[in-house]
């Protein structure tokens, strides 16, 4: 099982690459839309990448509750058990 730090590292890398932001901006507290400039299409792309990378399914209802990088890490961590 991946540790929280390993999950965060992979999530950070994916977000940095997809959104074209420096990895130093991608903190657990960073808001995907407000701080990192993601839009709804970016979120869909990111979710597909997370699902592929971690082998988890992100439910649409759960996606609405995710606003920060830390939310994503916690969600994936929970899904991986």
Swiss-Prot record:
Record pathway: Lipid metabolism; fatty acid biosynthesis
Residues with PTM O-(pantetheine 4'-phosphoryl)serine: 40
Chain ranges of the Carrier domain: 5-80
UniProtKB keywords: Cytoplasm, Fatty acid biosynthesis, Fatty acid metabolism, Lipid biosynthesis, Lipid metabolism, Phosphopantetheine, Phosphoprotein
GO terms assigned for molecular function: acyl binding; acyl carrier activity
Modification after translation: 4'-phosphopantetheine is transferred from CoA to a specific serine of apo-ACP by AcpS. This modification is essential for activity because fatty acids are bound in thioester linkage to the sulfhydryl of the prosthetic group.
UniProt record, GO biological process: lipid A biosynthetic process
Localization: Cytoplasm
Principal localisation: cytoplasm
Entry's Gene Ontology cellular component terms: cytosol; membrane
InterPro entries in alphabetical order: ACP, ACP-like_sf, PP-bd_ACP, Ppantetheine_attach_site
Record Pfam families: PP-binding
Function text: Carrier of the growing fatty acid chain in fatty acid biosynthesis.
Record NCBIfam families: acyl_carrier, PRK00982.1-2, PRK00982.1-4, PRK00982.1-5
Protein family according to the UniProt entry: Belongs to the acyl carrier protein (ACP) family.
Protein name: Acyl carrier protein
High-level lineage: Bacteria, Thermotogati, Thermotogota, Thermotogae, Thermotogales
């Amino acid at each position: 099982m991946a540790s929280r730090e390993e999950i965060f590292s992979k999530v950070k890398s994916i977000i940095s690459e997809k959104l074209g932001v420096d990895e130093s901006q991608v903190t657990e507290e960073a808001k995907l839309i407000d701080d990192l400039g993601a839009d709804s299409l970016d979120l869909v792309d990111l979710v597909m990448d997370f699902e592929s990378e971690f082998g988890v399914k992100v439910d649409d209802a759960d996606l609405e509750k995710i606003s920060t990088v830390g939310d994503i890490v916690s969600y994936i961590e929970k899904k991986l058990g």
